Swiss-Prot record:
Positions with biased composition (Polar residues): 8-25
GO terms, molecular function: bHLH transcription factor binding; DNA binding; protein heterodimerization activity
Species of origin: Xenopus tropicalis
The encoding gene: hes1
Domain of life, per lineage: Eukaryota
Main location: nucleus
Name of the featured protein: Transcription factor HES-1
One example of a Gene Ontology biological process annotation: negative regulation of DNA-templated transcription
Length: 267
C-alpha cells in the first residue's frame, strides 16, 4: 500500500473529532438564569393584569357614582384608586348608620373595640423608649379626643312603646296606659275592646292613631307588636268617664264584680 494513502486513512478519524463535539447538547440552565430570562415576560403579564383590573374598576366606579364615562375617559390610575377609596368609605359609613338604626348594640361594640385598641396603643407607647415624647403626647391626646367624641354619640331615637301591665284573668289583652298623648285632668282608664275595625278612617296624631269610638268619644290606638296585626285593638279613651268595655261574648250578669284591681290607677 502506498505511504500517501495510509496517511490519508490515519488522519480522517482525527479530522472528524471536532465536528462530533460541536453537536453535543448545551448545559441545562440554572434556576437563577431561568428567572432572569423569564423576568421580562412575567413583568409584562403583571402590567397587563394591573391595567385590566384598573379598567374594570374605572367602569364600576363611574357607574356607582352615576358619572358620564365619556367625560372621564382619560382618568389616571391614581384618580381611579382615590375615587374607589372615597366610595368605599361612604358605603362603610352608610352601613354603619344602618346597623346603628337596626341594632343599637353595634355602637356599644364599637366603643368597646376602640377602647381596647386605645389601651393597647397607650401600653405600647408607655413601654417603648424610642418614641419621641412630643409625638407620644400628641397621639395620646388625639386618641383621647376621639374617645370622648365616641362616648358623646347617642343611640338613635326609636319610638317608645308604652309598657303593658299584668293582664287580668278575665281579659285576653293586658291593660295599657298612654303617657303624654293628650293633656287631661285625671288619668285615663284603658279598656280592651273586642270587635272589628273602626268604621271611620284612622288619623295619625303624635305617632298614634286617632279613631272615633262608637259612643262618640275618641280613642288613641296603640299598636302592640306582641299581638297580631288583625287581632284585638287596645284603645285609650280621652274621657276618663268611659267605663270598662266588656267583650260581646260576656254579659255583665255573668261577669264577676270588677273592682279597682282590673283597671290600673296611680292611687
Amino acid at each position: 500500500m502506498p505511504a500517501d494513502l495510509m496517511e490519508k486513512n490515519s488522519s480522517s478519524p482525527v479530522a472528524a473529532t471536532p465536528a462530533s463535539m460541536s453537536n453535543t447538547p448545551d448545559k441545562p440552565k440554572t434556576a437563577s438564569e431561568h428567572r432572569k430570562s423569564s423576568k421580562p415576560i412575567m413583568e409584562k403579564r403583571r402590567r397587563a393584569r394591573i391595567n385590566e383590573s384598573l379598567g374594570q374598576l374605572k367602569t364600576l366606579i363611574l357607574d356607582a357614582l352615576k358619572k358620564d364615562s365619556s367625560r372621564h375617559s382619560k382618568l389616571e390610575k391614581a384618580d381611579i384608586l382615590e375615587m374607589t377609596v372615597k366610595h368605599l368609605r361612604n358605603l362603610q359609613r352608610v352601613q354603619m348608620t344602618a346597623a346603628l338604626s337596626t341594632d343599637p348594640s353595634v355602637l356599644g361594640k364599637y366603643r368597646a373595640g376602640f377602647s381596647e385598641c386605645m389601651n393597647e396603643v397607650t401600653r405600647f407607647l408607655s413601654t417603648c423608649e424610642g418614641v419621641n415624647t412630643d409625638v407620644r403626647t400628641r397621639l395620646l391626646g388625639h386618641l383621647a379626643n376621639c374617645m370622648n367624641q365616641i362616648n358623646a354619640m347617642n343611640y338613635p331615637t326609636q319610638p317608645q312603646i308604652p309598657a303593658a301591665a299584668a293582664p287580668h284573668p278575665a281579659y285576653g289583652q293586658p291593660l295599657v296606659q298612654l303617657q303624654g298623648a293628650a293633656p287631661q285632668s285625671s288619668p285615663a282608664p284603658i279598656a280592651c275592646k273586642m270587635g272589628g275595625p273602626p268604621v271611620e278612617a284612622a288619623k295619625v296624631y303624635g305617632g298614634f292613631q286617632l279613631v272615633p269610638a262608637p259612643d262618640g268619644q275618641f280613642a288613641f290606638l296603640i299598636t302592640n307588636p306582641a299581638f297580631p296585626h288583625n287581632g284585638s285593638v287596645i284603645p285609650v279613651y280621652t274621657n276618663s268617664n268611659v267605663g270598662t268595655a266588656l267583650p260581646p261574648s260576656v254579659s255583665p250578669s255573668v261577669m264577676p264584680s270588677v273592682t279597682a284591681d282590673s283597671v290600673w290607677r296611680p292611687w
